[in-house]
Amino acid sequence: RRLARQRGIDVAALTATNDIVTGAAVESAPKRAPVDRTAAMRAATAELMARAAREIPHYYVVSTIDMTGALDWLRERNAAVKPRDRVLPAVLFLRAAVVAATKVPDLNGHWDDHFHPAPGVDLGVAVATRSGGLVTPRIVGAQDLDLTALMGQLSDLVKRAKAGRLKASELQPGSITVSSLADGGPDALYGVIYPPQVALLGIGSVAQRPWVVDGEAVVRSTVTVTLAADH
């Protein structure tokens, strides 16, 4: 029985030999599938997003940005620090979103009959789960985190989100959300605002594309960024 509890197996479902369930029977039984603790949250999120798409008057502002210089800087930075302090390009977008939300506080907060500006930036990050759903845990006080700290928080949230082990407090609405696509994916992302927030930043894939520099056509690493805002 102790072995069955450890493996998450219902003893009553096992075949007994002479009315005795053996350890071999327990060990050969398939393990119970891990519980996805975010399942209820994902269902609630789906309902909330459907309502948001119907009720929030979205408008979109789109800009394509040359990332070549930023990526060159990031490669040099990562080469100069220890492996544990290296960061992914995605963290540059998170940091940029934090800076932008600080400079434009009208996009950083919640709407409930009227707008409530947030005292800091609690950055929501859209994360795909292993079961195919989407959750948006938040990084509290992101305005106080440097790139290395942001990277640490992001890695931890993504790991636990995929394992279904996020805390309820981490799944509370942030003050603004960033949703990004993996490199090699679609060019742009037009997101749906996560209520009660009033804005969402969608990051497309970074790829080499034609660009004009000083009147000359060149190849640069660019990304299309889309701001979804509540009109």
For each feature predicted by the language model, list its residue ranges.
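C-terminal catalytic/motor cores of large multi-domain enzyme assemblies
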Residues: 3, 7-10, 25-230
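Major-groove DNA-recognition helix of helix-turn-helix-type DNA-binding domains
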Residues: 11-17
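Acidic Ca2+-chelating loop motifs
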Residues: 19-21
